[in-house]
Amino acid sequence: MNQNKPLWPIGSLIVLTGLNLLDYLDRQLLAAVLTPIKDELRLSDEQLGTIQSEFMWGYFLTSPIFGYLGDRVARRWLVAAGVFVWSLGTLMSGHVSALGALIFYRVLVGFGEASFGTISPGWVADLFPANRRNNAISIFYLAIPVGSAFGYIIGSAVAARYGWRAAFLWAGYPGLLLAFLLFLLKEPPRGATEQAVGALKAEPPGGWRVYRELFNYPRYVLVIAGYVAQTFALGGFALWAPTFLYRVHHMGYEEAGRYFGLSLVVTGLVATLAGGFAATAWQRRTGTGYAWVLALSSLLTAPAAFVAFAAADLTISKIALAAAMFLIFLATGPVNTLILETVPVGMRASAMAGSIFSIHMFGDLWSPRLVGYLSDRWGDLQKAALWVLPGALVVSAFFWCWLVLWTKRENARAAGVPRS
């Protein structure tokens, strides 16, 4: 294929988005089958939360390595290897008979997803110029709600009919085959589309100093700080929400998984597109659109999440859960665009790696286990979720409101407007 043809970036975006969808399907599959795993392996809620937390260790500890490599060596080989490894880990998760083995293979999934998650966003960014990039990244990250929803829906349905092991087997095989699709793509040069708009390319600092260098970009730091808190909330929400519906509102676990998955795919798809395109239009007019969408997303999600977990009525809880999902996914495109655009081109993979490390090390590494621990301690999953998750969203809103103010100040300085 000719990389210079107009359709080439779109074809590459389709392939990478499809693989990203499979990534999130595999990642959220565990949440759909928590109940049968708990029953068969006789695990506590804290142990169930630990499975997801250990996956995060594998994911974020290797992301700086892949970020370093992703700014320096051929991305296609690294990404293909990542897809193969996470798919193998998912497949083998269906053959375990003990907690330790399941944790081992979920960590392996984390290794593979770290490669793909760190490197592929920069690849997408290099396919499109700045005025189209946020829309492309929003499409790429549609995989989060859609893939996650497929994980919940298909995982719970397969587990109900054939057992939870079959769900992992079903999800593992496609990735082993789809990894080879990447070898049909040609990599765009790093910063290829920046040349078209006259942007300067910057070489990354040598060695591991690149990660220290990220702290010299205040907007990047504020984006990540808010993203850490949002991911803390989202991690606990994603793992425990179907189980919350099952225990507190007495839905069957297949019904709970199906409802949560269908709500996620509809609200997440609409919100990711709406947030991405609205932020692009707002950004063109004001220069602060990306930051505003982030701030409003967390500000509005916090009360919706509180109502979702506090409501005694199932209908109110379901409506509030759907509203919270819609509002939180408004930020998907803009937050990832800002991660890539607040640093020089030559540091994009490292910036994404720094994001992955931070949001998991200080975010959803802890929230699933914390909610599980408090649920065991208090004997009340509803109370545990209510105390932990909405509060984290308030913290996220604080940092992203600060980002709005900082961005306004930077824009005014760039325009030569004196500070009052």
Which positions does each model-derived feature cover?
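Cytoplasmic helix-loop-helix junction between adjacent transmembrane helices
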Residues: 105-145
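Juxtamembrane intracellular "pre-TM" segments in multi-pass secondary transporters
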Residues: 2-5, 191-224, 248
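Structural signature of the two symmetry-related core transmembrane helices
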Residues: 77-91, 290-305
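A membrane-interface helix-boundary motif in multi-pass transporters
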Residues: 160-173, 252-255, 289-292, 373-392
